[in-house]
Amino acid sequence: MFTNIVPKFEKGRILKTAMLENLRDFPREYADIYYRDYADGIVTGANIEVAEEALTVTPGIVKYNGRLYLLNQPAIVAYQATGRETVVKIRFHEGAVDSDWNIYRSDIVIDEHIESRPSELELCRFKLKEGAKLRQDYQNFRDLSTEYNTVNLLHVRFAAYGQSTVSPFIMRYFGDELLRRGSSEPQDLAFAMMSLNEGILNRKVITHYIANRLGIANKDYSNVEIHRHLARILESVRGGGGRMGMSSGGSLRVIVD
């Protein structure tokens, strides 16, 4: 499970080995300062790996309620085919205090309550039919939103400056597919390179690109809406590229008789 354990160094208390190991293994002050202005979400890791009857959550760091939580060993979560939408979540608990530690713990749970509560953070969701196999071998960018038998990462929040953002897996997938389709638009090339190189992009960068590329309003789109708009951009590249609703050729000329 994800934990946030802080040793309490106080005058008159016995210094314990575990307290020093905690201090050694996690440079707390540096990390807290570095991510202070980041919104809650996954900081790094916490990827989902699919096996036949269980999911593995890989080691990672998440931010919740201003605190960093560390998962230093893979966590195994069993799942079943129910035909209903199921969400894998981190559920955070109230903090506890004893003479040596401030402790903030969590559990990784599978829940059919789709909306995440204030004390929860989504890791993925899926809707698995009985007799089918859960998969994550996406065939294309659209496939990321396939309803049945597919790991869905669209609703996952990643920590970023100011506000949470879209999974870097989704953005890298988009960047790779955009380049492979051969777009000649300079903004496409720049955005694709940035997506592949950085992964975690500020949400405003994504929405500005979408608005400019599609000629639509720049709004705080949801993760699902962002995916849908990015898929439209990929489809426009297949059809010849260019800003939608505008000529993909050179400059326009007007001849007056």
Language-model regions, residue ranges each:
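N-terminal "first-domain core" detector
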Residues: 1-62
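Beta-strand-rich solenoidal segments
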Residues: 5, 9, 62-257
